[in-house]
Amino acid sequence: MEKLYCGMPLLLLVLLLASIDGSTQLQSSQSQTLLRLQQLLYYPKVLNSWNNYTDFCNSEPSPSLTVVCYEDSVTQLHIIGDNGTHMLPKSFSINSFVTTLVKLPDVKVLTFVSLGLWGWLPQKINRLSSLEILNVSSNFLFGPIPHELSSLATLQTLILDENMFSGELPDWIDSLPSLAVLSLRKNVLNGSLPSSLSSLSGLRVLALANNRFNGALPDLSHLTNLQVLDLEGNSFGPLFPRLSNKLVTLILSKNKFRSAVSAEEVSSLYQLQHLDLSYNTFVGPFPTSLMSLPAITYLNISHNKLTGRLSANLSCNSQLMFVDMSSNLLTGSLPTCLKPSSGTSRDVVYASNCLATTNEDQRPVSFCSNEALAVGILPQRRNKVSKVGIALGVTASILGVLLLAGALFVVLRRLNAKKTVTKSSPRLIRENASMGYTSKLLSDARYISQTMKLGGLGLPAYRTFSLEELEYATNNFESSAFMGEGSQGQIYRGRLKDGSFVAIRCLKMKKSCSTQNLMHHIELIAKLRHRHLVSVLGHCFECYLDDSTVSRMFFVFEYVPNGELRTWISDGHMGRLLTWEQRISVAIGVAKGIQFLHTGIVPGVYDNNLKMTDILLDNNLAAKLSSYNLPLLVEGLGKVGQVGSRSGPKGTPSIKDEDKIDIYDFGVILLELIVGRPLRAKSQVDVLKEQLQASISADDGARRSMVDPTVHRACSDQSLKTMMEICVRCLLKDPLERPSIEDVLWNLQFASQVQEGWLQNSNPSSNLGSPSPAASSLPPPSRLHVTTLESPRDSGCEEHER
């Protein structure tokens, strides 16, 4: 009996433990909060398993959905949607979403990726006082990074990648003392980095790639824990930055660095594994010690102007697996450790240097020497030479070149005097038709995002054409190839030897310019490539024999076969008109073209004088802008700095609203897409705008009475109302009140989604005009306009007060 009594406490303890549920039970209020989030996110597929009976804290985690609880509260919530998720409907409220999140007071980690979230990140985000990790990447959030984030003292990771955040990186960033990861890739952030960034001693990852940041970098050597620095695709420069010696990954590609690569800085990076300095203008000697850094595995210095003489006995780290040193000014021999015979499997690219190899892609040594002189750098020599000797050598070389040039000039003048013609024959083509300029023109791709590169457009690389090629394409510019003449020259339709059609614009130069003076403008023009622009494929210079100045320029454009947009709206292209869905798609294409002109290249191209007749349609009915403000067309030379400087109704310069002039022009185009008839006067635009404004607040019938009769029964009311609202906002008199191009795009995409859903749920009785274009073997001529800075406005619609 005594033994039984002694065992009773142990038995009671076992029974007590068995009676306790081994699982964590979430508070009912927090369960309701999670279900409310599901509702606010419009029931995404990833949350299909959630219902009133879900045991959230004990659900099986997955890569796309995880809920972590501690005791009876949610501490982590990870929701990852599908790639390419559309924006949530217009009724979505980011404020309501964050207000609901605040009801999870103990949450430390939030991940909301690819869920279609949109709007300004609200100020009440600071109520998530326990937050340590916030990841809202791959959504549609915009506006500045809210100051209220600075009060989240425990925040360690902030990831805002692939959104539309704008403005500068705030200087309050040092108010986050625990911040270890800051990733803002693929937004539209701009300005220089604040010096306060240097105070984040705990920062391990700084990723700012593919934004619009510029200027010199602050001193980063104090970030003693920084391991990853990714600044690709901005405009940082010109000096090589001061860095922490604990970096593992350093990416500075596609920026505006123009200094030497500091050998002292890089030689101390003993943990560096990945180094990418490509597509800059780094000059001076290439620090060969980079190849033998103790941890280096990836090295890319391509497309710079680095000099130096390589030797076969240079050493490489045995772990180095990838090296790209192409398109520099390197001489000497390829190091043995980089050759395939060295026994190590490495990817090595070294074309377009001046190396002594059997590779046919090398240039002559004289080329690298001359280019080095052009950038103020002398190639390294084996033996040490005094500064005085170098100076004397350079001086003698310059004098020799000047004497030779003078003698050649005298000879040419005498020969020219013997000619019987009164004017020099402009037949000297100073460039060969080749890909020779491609590297120079397109290597500077730091202003263009990866998705806008050549391969994705299906276009050939920008190149120089010979006059013979253009004469062949147009049958010596015969009249049958003539398409028209505007203020900027004649346009011909041509067919190249490969069978592709092109549009060729011929410009007679009104001022004396050498080819060298024009190359800066050519480099800008070569970058204007986008799916929704009529892109330039190349150029040709024709020069006078006597002084080699350019007499004529030819620009070769891609050919757009389906003609002007207006013929598909009001004129009835071959008896067909665009459907409502196609009109929305065209509007989205035009907006994307404008967005690229404003943000896809630096400096942006503004004040493009866009008109309905400037929008062309390709075989897939994709819209292409054929008129944009190129600085190099006759009168525009020497005025590049004034691009986009005019603003608003009064024509006064303003940096803040320079993009809003194109927004007004877009509003006029959108108005014509809606009403379906040509608008050729400002008075028409003003009257229709007022009618549109009144119909928005009226009933459905009033709105449909404004629409092109051929499509007014084939559009949903919400889609139509959204299009009308954004159109009226674009036409506001005050430029500052007009929407941004990102706002325009959001509304157009929302209208498209609403229309798509409406079509799926109904069978409209009138869906007139479903074009099915077929390109003929010789497409009809399409108009091509390229606007200069000082050119008179083309006819077709009088210039509106913008």
Swiss-Prot record:
Extracellular-side positions: 27-391
Protein name per UniProt: Probable inactive leucine-rich repeat receptor-like protein kinase At3g03770
Recorded topology in the membrane: Single-pass type I membrane protein
Keyword Glycoprotein: yes
Ranges for region Disordered: 761-802
Gene Ontology annotations for the cellular component aspect, listed alphabetically: plasma membrane
Location in the cell: Cell membrane
Organism superkingdom: Eukaryota
Gene Ontology terms, MF aspect: ATP binding; protein kinase activity
Family: Belongs to the protein kinase superfamily. Ser/Thr protein kinase family.
Domain notes: The protein kinase domain is predicted to be catalytically inactive.
Sequence ranges of Low complexity compositional bias: 762-777
InterPro entries xref list: Kinase-like_dom_sf, LRR_dom_sf, LRR_R13L4/SHOC2-like, LRR_Rcpt-Like_S/T_Kinase, Prot_kinase_dom
Annotated glycosylation sites: N52, N83, N135, N190, N300, N313
Transmembrane portions of the chain: 392-412
Keyword terms of this UniProt record: Cell membrane, Glycoprotein, Leucine-rich repeat, Membrane, Receptor, Repeat, Signal, Transmembrane, Transmembrane helix
Segments on the Cytoplasmic face: 413-802
Basic and acidic residues compositional bias, start-end: 791-802
Pfam families: LRR_14 (PF23598), Pkinase (PF00069)
Signal sequence, renumbered to the chain: 1-26
Domain Protein kinase: 477-759
Ranges occupied by LRR repeats: 71-94, 104-128, 129-152, 153-176, 177-200, 201-225, 227-244, 245-268, 269-293, 294-317, 319-341
